[in-house]
């Protein structure tokens, strides 16, 4: 059945992610997050271009980690004679939103994040949502200029170390662990730095 094949695919993707994570010495979630693996198991991308249509996979991640995943998916599709959904081949990556581009450009110019939020009519936490999406899709950004301005260096190191040693990048878990000492915003800011440096 379809759902059984999708489950098998998901398990094979997870195993591969685990192998890569050991080999590259990065946490599994840095390679691809669970929702990305689930999307791969339902749409079966078999080229790097198609892989970039998967939520949370940008050009950077596709190039870095994608090759072994698409080979695995290709094998699975052939072995199980799976009909792949057509729409995946049609969609393109061209719809990267103007907002993302403008955020990346402003960060490159070291504009303060609260100012970027204001310019784009966003709440600060909405801006962080956007930046997280940018980083998860494999684009490297450097917000050190802002972090060093608003946080103490040892606080940054403390949160960074937490993510380095953690099994998950889950925000709720981090807040539970660190929330007594740090605000949610501080934790999210350092998590962005961590993901950008580790994953990209």
Segments (PLM) and residue ranges:
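C-terminal non-catalytic scaffold/interaction domains in large multidomain proteins
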Residues: 77-172, 176-200
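Single conserved hydrophobic/aromatic residue that forms the stacking wall/gate
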Residues: 1-7, 11
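Generic detector of short, aliphatic-rich beta-strand segments that form the cores of beta-sheets
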Residues: 9-10, 69, 187
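Helix-hairpin-helix
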Residues: 14, 21-69, 96-99, 123-128, ...
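Intrinsically disordered, low-complexity glycine/proline-rich and charged
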Residues: 60-86
């Amino acid at each position: 059945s379809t759902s059984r094949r999708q489950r098998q695919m998901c398990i094979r993707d997870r195993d591969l992610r685990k192998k890569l994570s050991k080999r590259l010495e990065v946490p599994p979630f840095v390679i691809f997050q669970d929702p990305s693996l689930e999307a791969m198991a339902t749409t079966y991308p078999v080229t790097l271009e198609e892989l970039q249509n998967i939520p949370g996979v940008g050009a950077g991640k596709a190039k870095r980690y994608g090759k072994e995943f698409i080979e695995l998916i290709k094998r699975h599709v052939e072995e199980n004679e799976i009909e792949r959904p057509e729409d995946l081949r049609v969609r393109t990556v061209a719809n990267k939103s103007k907002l993302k581009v403008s955020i990346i450009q402003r960060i490159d110019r070291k504009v303060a994040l609260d100012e970027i939020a204001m310019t784009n009519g966003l709440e600060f936490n909405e801006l962080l949502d956007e930046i997280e999406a940018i980083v998860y899709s494999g684009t490297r950004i450097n917000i050190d200029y802002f972090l060093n301005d608003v946080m103490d260096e040892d606080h940054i190191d403390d949160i960074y170390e937490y993510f380095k040693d953690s099994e998950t990048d889950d925000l709720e878990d981090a807040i539970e662990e660190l929330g007594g000492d740090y605000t949610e915003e501080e934790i999210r800011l350092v998590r962005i730095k961590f993901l950008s440096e580790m994953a990209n």
